[in-house]
Amino acid sequence: MRRALVAVIALAIALPACSGSADPATGTTGSGATPSAVADPATGSTGASTGVVEAATIPEPDAWIPRRVGVLVDRLESVWEVRREAVRRWVRTGDPAAWPPPEEVELLVLYEQRIYRVLAANDRLAAAVLGRLDGGLAAEARSNVRAGSALYDHFSPVKTLPDFRTRAPEPADRLLRFFEEGQRRFGVTWQTLAAVMLIETRMGRIASSSSAGAQGPMQFIPSTWAAYGLGGDIRDEHDAVLGAANYLHANGAPGNDRAALFHYNPVPAYVAAVTGYANAMTRDPELFYAYYNWQVFVRTTHGDVRLTGPGL
């Protein structure tokens, strides 16, 4: 279809142009349950949390990430619990239809994201940490690490920092409505559409066109957009989501999501990453609100460089 953006997507590496050939693998990414309808997997409750996140539990934007297995496991478990509470409170008693998100949510999610980037780049450390997790965190962490590792293994870091333009994304609930509309109209799960935008532009935070000319929050080549964009604006989030849903539906989704995603971007690592994040949101739909707050990083030969988020 098109080529998917320059490196910054999950890892700051340019993805090659789509060939239009189908992936022989098949599979779907799950149900269409929405965050507002999901129960807490740990307790079965759908009630709002009344807890208050203590300031001492909120990490600074560049807080240290331990490399000792036991310490890292403890840190990930504690931050995961606090983040889930903070997200649940934001979704159920706050206003996820407005920008910006609560600072506590941004900071907690950022710390988790940085941990997963460390694990994705270190197979031995990841295996040791994942082996000591259980329950919902274990499943979520496996999805995040495997998706990140697939992209890390396939793409190399860049030597120089690309010139990216970034911006604030549309509010979380507004994007979610667009994804749900794409599911209603074309049958492509909202989780798949959200995972595509997550990888392509971090939910619209990347405003630049790619080096290959792909444009907008779903990174379409203009010629492909002309065929599948339904007459909309390539840079408009609503129109881009519907165009992506139309394209994926035309190439096998739902029912053969992997083949459809391979048409979207013919890189197995990309297909694996989208599928992993989509499956994670299928297991826990409220995870969408965490992924929504993932920031733009560029993976360089000198280490990660963060371009968006708290403290910048």
Q: What are these model-derived regions, one by one?
A:
Residues 1-184, 268, 276-312:
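Cell-wall glycan-active module
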Residues 97, 164, 209-210, 229, ...:
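Residue-level detector of alpha-helix boundaries and kinks
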Residues 107, 111, 195-198, 243, ...:
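Amphipathic alpha-helical interaction segments
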Residues 124-128, 187-195, 208, 253-264, ...:
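Surface-exposed patches in mature extracellular/periplasmic domains of secreted proteins
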Residues 170-185, 191, 217, 222-278:
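Alpha-helical segment that forms one wall of the substrate-binding/catalytic cleft
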Residues 202-205:
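Periplasmic/extracellular electron-transfer cofactor-ligation site
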Residues 207-210, 274-275:
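Short, solvent-exposed loop/turn and secondary-structure capping segments
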